[in-house]
Curated annotation (Swiss-Prot):
GO biological process terms, semicolon-separated: morphogenesis of a branching epithelium; regulation of branching involved in salivary gland morphogenesis
All residue ranges annotated as the BTB domain in the record: 142-211, 247-341
Stretches the record annotates as Disordered: 1-24, 897-1019, 1035-1132
GO CC annotations on file: nucleus
Biased composition (Basic and acidic residues): 928-939, 1000-1019, 1083-1093, 1105-1114
PROSITE patterns per the UniProt record, alphabetical: BTB
Protein name in the entry: BTB/POZ domain-containing protein 7
Length: 1132
């Protein structure tokens, strides 16, 4: 579908006939040749003094040439001014900001390409070949029967005679209507299906069946010798139109007064009638088909057959002018709209021509003729003729015809496709339009549509300037209309003497421009000290200052050109070509000059939340274009109309639309638009949705069909991207609001096995993966799929990334087993925020207690908040900036509880499993100042946020039966910068590394600590207090110092809330692994140290020294407040 929308303007060239050179000359110059400015329109003659007119002509031509030079120079200076203004704006910018602006322009350019394709989309018109195939299949108006192997084939005499010399000779012997001709074919091997395929080929030029015998050259040669080799279908049909052999219908034109005479038997001259074939006109036009079938039902056709006279069709010339009849028939036979075949004599029945003659207007232009013919095509239901007229009108768009075409296409009977092309011309040539007189004839609606476009080719200063001029002109017209009739046309009228600017009423001018000025992007006006802007503000037309003049919370000035530095609602700059080219030029120069800065990572931020409440209210990107109006339980049937006026199409058409939508999504152009417009995926999806709707002939208001198809077809499945509709509880899907704790992102396990096509995401801070990392992902178990919730086509996001978690509810304190990670409290829950009570359960030897503890721990793991999985870096960044000014020396009491290692087989301790597998890539960013150490026995790797592979989309909740990878597997448990809520991968929390202990000693070492009312854990009397002194400015070590006499260790512990954490930030800070990822050791050194650590406890001091050295290496890159911080501070 929509093949005609991709090759404009070349798509219209085959349909438009006539002289191509004359058509090219017509565009933009037609009004002059039609209005008497040609060579033949000589208004006067001079018998004497031929030299004076020649001299005057020379002087005029010389002055005109000089004027053109000045105009050309002024235009070039204007373009140079735009480039100079953009260069001055970017003079003080950083190279990253210029790069961000250029990327914004590239994203807008990709959207413009999709918007252009959508504006060119329209339903595919039926071609001559398709209509002839339907004619052979449905047997409209057949007049002869072919008998072959006792099978009757009704056919059309004129088509077979024009296509095949064999049938021309055969049918000439039986000229009567309905003759039966027995076929005797000498070629061997011709059966009934093959004969039917031969007839189908004569009608369409293609074989209708896939038969291997048609690949045999010998059979084709024998058929060509017997039947002859036909020409192409276009050539033979053109010959049939020219000679009209075996015609069986005539078209007569008359006014209402002549209809009685026509029926009374008064025949017009045959030269005044047009001959045609019933088969062709019934195949191409449903209007003529229904007319001829009605004549057959009423018996009128039998009379014509008895008298052997052609069928006469009388048309009202006031509806279908006679001069267009030849153009209509020519298009029916050839699929080409050729206005050059118009009859020389005008039709007196044409109402528009009568009005033109009365008004004294010149002859109709080519565009006006195409407009009138377009209405006739719609009346005849002849889509090929209608689209050909649309192409002619679109080619005729110029400054002279723009207003007339815009007005005509705006009417209900006008063409929406032509209206989109006229608006596109207005936006592309707006700089030329606003400096001409045509600009003041534009209506407010057309002007409003133009200035709302992101692709308007004009600077904001010129838009504001000429909008005010347009408003002043409209106000002068109002004043002229209000003046008395006695002054109209006199020297005292407003049109003659004019109105001074100071005499205009500002209130009335403001009322005229009130609906237009809000769409002028004042923040993007260049130069910044624009006189046009200051004058408009002095006159009171603009009351609010631009947002870049307003101070932000950081005390500086915002940048309205950049998305991440905008103070308010971001409005992207228009894709003005001089600005775009100059910005790219400046970026190239800066990248050459600042090579060192370019090597740094340029992080693109798009729609990044700037406050914590926006992180809390975050929803999947696909949801903000969906209405989610699900079918209620009391509603018996789905809706039958869309947008209260458009009927819902049939299911087969709906499936074709969804298939076409998926096909467009996988194209390179759409994927590029998705990649360049991160965060604007809904806009990209909407462009391709309205393109599909227009290709299927539906209005743009029916976009909900593709955004939420399950609302209209609840029992159907539309491809891989559309699960079945489920009955959802109220409040289950909430857009831009805080979801209730009980219903937030529940029942999403089904999307684990759901992999829609995705655009390539941006790759900021992506840690390199290892083969072991992928093996661990592949080892995750997949949950059984449950019922799918409603899914939209607005944005192809991956719902498998949102894992199933439920909000914590009131109940007994959870118990953590050594094999389960201690989850931080859910900051998105309103109940018990920051007051999560945690207690260590006393382990018993009974299996019942162990099973109960395992169930409680599994429930706690499932209560991990979805927030930190969605946007971990954003949440941690917010908590970091809110705590960076509150750093005070504190006496941190070590509240960590120690538990013995769970029973395991012989081998190295599990807390040493990550020592030989530390990652050698050491570059990473630290978001927080207070790093808490969290341990667990079973290290677990979370799926990467930017990894959309099948192995990555697995549930992250560990099962109790999962096996911990041994150290020989080389599992990588380094930091995942997009999973900050993980616990540390090792159980190392003291200053020394203990050896293996017996299970009996481990059982004796288990203790239980009660909680105090203030939330801190009580210690036993024999346990010393561990102090962690923080200096000023604090550079806290990541490893707490433990007393050497404390020999009880355990891989699982619970982290309490420290003094610097608040209710809003508790649980958002990342748990930094106790073993740093920074390591520069050789493999030999690491293996040697691993053996030494596993042998005895005497190397604890050496290990502590190595850890402190690694911590000092990574400390320089940890604090965001350092002046030599390598990464640019974000908009947070």
């Amino acid at each position: 579908m929509g093949a005609n929308a991709s090759n404009y303007p070349h798509s219209c060239s085959p349909r438009v006939g006539g002289n191509s050179q004359a058509q090219q000359t017509f565009i933009g110059t037609s009004s002059y040749s039609q209005q008497g400015y040609g060579c033949e329109s000589k208004l006067y003659s001079l018998d004497h003094g031929h030299e004076k007119p020649q001299d005057k002509k020379k002087r005029t031509s010389g002055l005109a040439t000089l004027k053109k030079k000045f105009i050309k120079r002024r235009k070039s200076n204007r373009s140079a001014d735009h480039a100079k203004q953009m260069r001055e704006l970017l003079s003080g910018w950083d190279v990253r900001d210029v790069n961000a602006l250029v990327e914004e322009y590239e994203g807008t350019s990709a959207l413009k390409e999709l918007s252009l394709q959508a504006s060119l989309a329209r339903p595919e018109a039926r071609t001559l070949q398709k209509d002839m195939a339907d004619l052979y299949e449905y047997k409209y108006c057949t007049d002869v029967d072919l008998i072959f192997q006792e099978t009757c084939f009704p056919v059309h005499r004129a088509i077979l005679a024009a296509r095949c010399p064999f049938f021309k000779t055969l049918l000439s012997s039986s000229p009567e209507y309905g003759a039966e001709i027995i076929m005797d074919i000498n070629t061997a091997g011709i059966d009934m299906p093959m004969f039917s395929a031969l007839l189908h080929y004569l009608y369409t030029g293609e074989f209708g069946m896939e038969d291997s015998r048609f690949q045999n050259v010998d059979i084709l040669v024998q058929l060509s010798e017997e039947f002859g080799t036909p020409n192409s279908l276009d050539v033979d049909m053109r010959g049939l139109f020219d000679y009209m052999c075996y015609y069986d219908v005539v078209l007569s034109f008359s006014s209402d007064s002549e209809l009685v005479e026509a029926f009374g038997g008064n025949q017009n001259c045959l030269d005044e009638e047009l001959k045609a074939h019933k088969a062709v006109i019934s195949a191409r036009s449903p209007f003529f088909r229904n007319l001829l079938q009605r004549r057959i039902r009423t018996g009128e056709e039998i009379t014509d057959r008895t008298l052997r006279t052609p069928t006469r069709i009388i048309l009202d010339e006031s509806i279908i002018p006679k001069k267009y009849a030849t153009v209509i028939l020519h298009c029916m036979y050839t699929d080409v709209v050729d206005l050059s075949v118009l009859h020389c004599s005008p039709s007196v029945g044409s109402l528009s021509e009568v009005q033109a003659l009365v008004a004294g207007k010149p002859n109709m232009t080519r565009a006006e003729e195409a407009m009138e013919l377009y209405h006739i095509a719609l009346f005849l239901e002849f889509n090929m003729l209608a689209q050909g007229c649309e192409d002619i009108i679109a080619e005729s768009i110029s400054l002279d015809t723009l207003i007339a075409i815009l007005k005509w296409s705006s009417h209900p009977y006008g063409s929406k496709w032509v209206h989109r092309q006229a608006l596109h011309f207005l936006c592309e040539e707006f700089s030329q339009v606003m400096t001409s007189d045509v600009f003041y004839e534009l209506s407010k609606d057309h002007l409003l549509t133009a200035i709302q476009s992101d692709y308007l080719q004009a600077s904001e200063q010129d838009i504001l300037k000429y909008l005010i001029k347009w408003g002043e002109h409209q106000l002068m017209k109002r004043i002229a209309d209000r003046e008395p009739n006695l002054l109209s046309g006199t020297a005292h009228s407003v049109n003659k003497r004019g109105v001074k600017r100071r005499d205009l009423d500002m209130e009335e001018l403001r009322e005229i421009l009130s609906s237009l000025l809000p769409f002028v992007r004042i923040e993007h006006i260049l130069p910044i000290n624009s006189e046009v802007l200051s004058d408009a503000m002095k006159r009171g037309l603009i009351s609010t200052p631009p947002s870049d003049m307003l101070p932000t919370t950081e005390g500086g000035k915002s940048n309205a050109w950049l998305r991440q530095k905008n103070a308010g609602i971001y409005v992207r700059p228009r894709l003005f070509s001089p600005y775009v080219e100059e910005a790219k030029s400046v970026l190239d120069e800066m990248m050459v000059e600042q090579t060192d800065l370019v090597r740094l990572r340029m992080v693109r931020m798009s729609n990044v939340p700037d406050t914590l409440y926006m992180v809390n209210n975050a929803v999947p990107q696909c949801c903000h274009m969906i209405s989610h109006q699900q079918i209620s339980s009391n509603q018996s049937s789905p809706p039958s109309v869309v947008a209260n006026e458009i009927p819902v199409p049939r299911l087969l058409i709906m499936k074709d639309m969804v298939r076409r939508l998926q096909e467009l999504r996988h194209t390179e152009q759409v994927q590029r638009a998705y990649a360049l417009n991160c965060g604007e995926g809904a806009t990209v999806s909407y462009e391709i949705q309205i393109r599909v709707l227009r290709e299927f002939g539906l209005a743009d208001a029916a976009a909900e069909l593709l955004q939420n198809p399950h609302k209209f077809f609840p029992d159907e499945r539309f491809g891989d991207e559309s699960p079945l509709l489920t009955m959802r509880q109220p409040g289950r899907c909430r857009v831009n609001s805080t979801p209730p704790a009980e219903t937030m992102f529940t029942d999403l396990d089904s999307f684990v096995a759901f992999h829609p096509p995705l655009p390539p995401p941006p790759p900021p801070y992506h840690p390199p993966a290892t083969p072991i990392h992928n093996q661990l992902k592949a080892g995750w178990k997949q949950r059984p799929p449950s019922q799918h919730p409603s899914r939209s086509f607005s944005y192809p996001c991956n719902h498998s990334l949102f894992h199933s978690r439920t909000a914590p509810k009131a109940g007994p304190p959870p118990v953590y087993l050594p094999s389960v990670k201690a989850a931080p409290p859910d900051c998105t829950s309103t109940a018990g925020l920051g007051r999560q009570t945690v207690a260590a359960a006393a382990a018993t030897t009974t299996s019942t207690a162990t099973a109960a503890a395992a169930a409680a721990s599994e429930k706690q793991v499932r209560t991990q908040p979805v927030l930190n999985d969605l946007m971990p870096d954003i949440a941690v960044g917010v908590s970091t900036l809110s705590l960076k000014d509150r750093r005070l020396p504190e006496l941190a009491v070590d509240t960590e509880l120690s538990q013995s290692v769970s029973e395991a087989g012989p081998g190295p301790p599990q807390h040493l499993s990550c020592i030989p597998q530390r990652h050698t890539h050491t570059s990473r960013k630290k978001h927080t100042l207070e790093q808490k150490t969290d341990t667990r026995e079973n290290p677990q790797e979370y799926p990467d946020f930017y990894d959309f592979s099948n192995a990555a989309c697995r549930p992250s909740t560990p099962a109790l039966s999962r096996r911990t990878p041994s150290p020989s597997q080389g599992g990588y448990f380094g930091p995942d910068l997009y999973s900050h809520n993980k616990a540390s991968p090792s159980g190392l929390k003291s200053a020394y590394l203990p050896g293996q202990t017996s299970p009996k000693k481990q059982e004796e070492a288990r203790r239980e600590y009660p909680l105090s009312p203030d939330g801190h854990l009580h210690r036993q009397k024999n346990e010393p207090i561990h102090l962690d002194v923080v200096e000023q400015p604090p550079q806290r070590s990541d490893f707490p110092l433990a007393a050497p006499e404390n020999a009880s260790t355990g891989p699982a512990h619970v982290r309490g809330r420290t003094a610097v954490e608040t209710d809003l930030t508790f649980g958002l800070t990342p748990n930094r692994p106790s073993l740093s990822a920074c390591s520069s050791e050789a493999p030999e050194e690491r293996s040697g140290r691993r053996l030494a650590d596993s042998e005895s406890l005497g190397h604890g001091a050496q290990r502590n020294t190595d850890l402190e050295r690694e911590d000092s290496i990574s400390r320089g890159r940890r604090s965001p407040s350092k002046p030599d911080f390598l990464y640019k501070k974000s908009a947070l």
